[in-house]
Structures are given as C-alpha cells and as structure tokens.
C-alpha cells in the first residue's frame, strides 16, 4: 500500500521480472515478427516499415505480409550493407487454401505460401494427412488441422518460427478456430 499526498491509501500491484544471476548481464532483444506493409494490408512500403521499427528502438523485425514473402526480402535489401545494430528477418503470413487459420513464417529461408502453388498436390497431401487426424473432429476440422500441421512443418523445415495468428478472431458470431483445434 502507498499513499500519495492528498489521496486516500490504495493498493497497487505490478509484475516483477527476476532472472538467474547468470542472465543479469545479458540484454534482452525487442522486436516484432508480425508486421504488414503496403504489399498487403499495411500502409507503408517495406523499407519504411523496417525503418520505423528501427526508429522506435526495436532490435529486430520480420515483415510478414499476407501471402507475400518477397516483400520481406525487399525490406532486407533496403538495409543491406549498412552497419547498423538492427536485424530484418524474412517472413510472410501464410494463408492455406480453404483454411481460415493464418500462420506466420518468421525467419524462414523460403516462402511456404509459394509451396501451395501446385494446388492439386497440396490438396492431395492435406487429404492424406486429414485421414490420420483424431476421429472426434469434423471433416472440416480434420482438414484444417492437417493443413496447419503441414504449414508448421514447412516453416520448421525452412528454419523459421511458426506462430498461429489471430487464434481468437471472431468471424460473424463464431471463433475462427474451434476449441478442439
């Protein structure tokens, strides 16, 4: 409890972050790995987004435009050769066909979205995987889960970080992703 002059006593709570002694000398990095530019639904060019991240003191960022890996390479190219303490990772927000679930590919070495260009091969692989999904799921849930699993595996194959985007989005009057998934 504490009292400020002229006010009544009140209780305040706040989180306290503590680390082991061997971590005290390390500096945590600040960054954002889910950003969009004007190459999808953002407002600014990829290089501008990266510069804005640097300006506000971030140490790293990944541009993850919707279905667009090349925009992140454009951001990287704008800063190539500059001696700055700022890291730009490639990325994209992956939108699998017939699946409302979006996933970030941050730092991956290739575009996962582009792997779905052969739609027939993609659909066949997802159908095969869906058959192995838990029986308690609906056919749509099995396909969505198989699709998400495939995307996450491809991201890991490219040494990227995979993140489930917007898991609690509400579309219409229902969550975008069911609780079972």
What are these regions (language model features)?
Residues 1-23:
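Beta-strand-enriched, solvent-exposed domains that form extended recognition/catalytic surfaces
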